[in-house]
């Protein structure tokens, strides 16, 4: 065979490199108990000497006996997602209640069903957005307060909840927009 230059047991042609036609990548053939002759890895980054893969001791991410605790930032994702899902569920129930109330005098037909479905969808999205936004504000305030104070305690939770409530309520009326807290948060 021309250009093959190998023994009869090697595959030749375009795909020869994929099927082990290259040289062995290691100096010792039986380091891991697996014969490595004739192997040619598909990816050069996977060509690792098996001696480096042997572990003498157990390795743990956390020290022995330590409990894994979530920080404020890790809890933020759970809080925001949970509030969005809870808001969607309660909003859907409220939409179903409102839809049934509005269509109780109508004959049971497709337009009535569509109106109920629209109310469920609209109310579910509204409540999910509202609770998700509140959870986002609460989580952001909690992370900022924790990073500023450098402590993780109940005072952060109370302060984050208070600031979230104040910011949420200050956007309700025009008179509240002139409050010092809203002016401070808006930067104007």
UniProtKB/Swiss-Prot annotation:
Keywords: Membrane, Mitochondrion, Mitochondrion inner membrane, Protein transport, Translocation, Transmembrane, Transmembrane helix, Transport
A molecular function GO annotation: protein transmembrane transporter activity
Subcellular location: Mitochondrion inner membrane
GO cellular component term of the entry, any: mitochondrion
Membrane topology: Multi-pass membrane protein
Biological processes annotated in GO: protein import into mitochondrial matrix
Chain segments annotated as transmembrane: 73-93, 125-145
Protein name from the UniProt record: Mitochondrial import inner membrane translocase subunit Tim23B
